Amino acid sequence: MKLSFVIILFALTNFSFVEKPVQLFNTSLTVTVRDEVGNTVVGASIKLFETEENYTKETNAVAEGVADAKGVFRFKKLKAAPYFVLVKKDDKDNSGGGEKIGKLEEGKFNKVTIVIQ
């Protein structure tokens, strides 16, 4: 009787709690910056904003980076949320087109290409 009770109790405790699966990868966003003819842009500043108001005022960026020699920067450990992206290099930027990206997929390597002109 005691053995049956222990077995039932053990079975109930193992199956009554569902653990959240372990996330293997952090949510990230890789931004590739290109100019109007498709060439990658080295050294462009990239800022991510959570709201359109912050994007418009260029305040409270949640993350910032600079495009590398291949015109790429990877933001790591982001929330799975939509973002407004502002990219600038000298007198070129991406204002007026494609500033908002959709909600990032959680635990995935998200990618976007931004054109500046």
Model region roles, listed by residue range:
Residues K79-K92:
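A short, solvent-exposed beta-strand micro-motif common in secreted/extracellular proteins
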Residues V37-Y55:
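Short, ordered, surface-exposed loop/turn motifs in non-cytosolic proteins
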